[in-house]
């Protein structure tokens, strides 16, 4: 089938989703390069243990994205077992057969791309869209990829979780509604 549309897939643990994630999402939306954008919270990450439950992370994504015209997929959260990009790509390609899938990945994760589960098969299904961060070095790869430069915000979910647990202020790193959700649910040691 000829693929006449372009669909960006932005997956992540989103533990929690923060303004850095939203900055990338808004850049993708403003670029007008994609007919659709699907945000996919990871269900059971292969490389790290999520702190918040999958349901809380999904709800924070829903809250953060608000009325943006974006699809939020719960396919990984509903799938039992470890979440792998290949399984998600297969499922989303079946649901979007006329779309070329573009897998959004940060330059830090792209540096480790050769270690991903079934990477050769994944690379046949998607084109990687690498988000270059200031100061990052991207090595040449045999996988189809394109690069976008975004002035990334210096925010990390790990830093946010550690700051909450340590009682430090993090309001400037999160959308206000996500911060309220975290406080209300007592996530990451907040009270």
Enumerate the language-model features and the residues they cover.
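Nucleotidyltransferase catalytic core that binds NTPs
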Residues: 1-191
